[in-house]
Amino acid sequence: NEMVELEARRGKLALEQGKYMLQDAQTRIVEAQPAVVVKTLQRHGDLVETLLEQESHARLVMGRQGEQHQDQAQAIGSHLENVIRTVKQPILVVMTEFEAPKRFMIAYDGSITAKKALNQVLTSPLLKGLECHLVMVSDAQSQATAELALVTESLMAANFNVVTAVCQGEVQTALEIYQLEHHIDLMVMGAYGHSRIREFFVGSNTTKMISKSHIPLLLLLR
């Protein structure tokens, strides 16, 4: 059967292409970080299903653009959006070029899920040594300042150098302005509660933020 033979050849070519891609990625990592031990895994099947199988011990780094969107600066690869909606482990979304960040920003709203995301920051070694900007978008200046003061104590106890700010206005605009003015290299976002931040970060707003961001985003999705 010609169709069966054609599919078999396509499958073999895809397998070989995947093998070469993994080898190339491994070589680039080893050349940049000789001390890093790199292990590769090639699987056949759906990407999201495979990542879910590895989810309990995986931390994901994914590029924003897929292969079909490399010439579109703000396009999001279809795989990335599907993974974000399904996988619950942290995902680092990177742009075309990546530099090690010196400072990161947490958009905080005081909800239970925001506190869970903050706890991941406190307990993870990944962000240690980076300057932390804790930012809240709220029209209630005094209340927000008091709430940030409590959170700042926890961050400082975990040896973070913390800068706090309360911004006013529309969430996306306020965060973008702060990011530019303070040279933020990394945005940290969680799956926030029923608030203005949640309205901004879930559903189509997540897609909007990722597509418009000029810096990497660390998504804390649990």
Predicted feature descriptions by range:
Residues 10-61, 157-187, 191-200, 207, ...:
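Structural beta-alpha unit
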Residues 36-93:
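Hydrophobic alpha-helical segments and helix pairs
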Residues 63-82, 101, 190-212:
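Glycine-rich, Arg-bearing micro-motifs that act as flexible, cationic patches
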Residues 66-67, 96-97, 137-139, 192, ...:
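Short, ordered loop/turn segments at secondary-structure junctions
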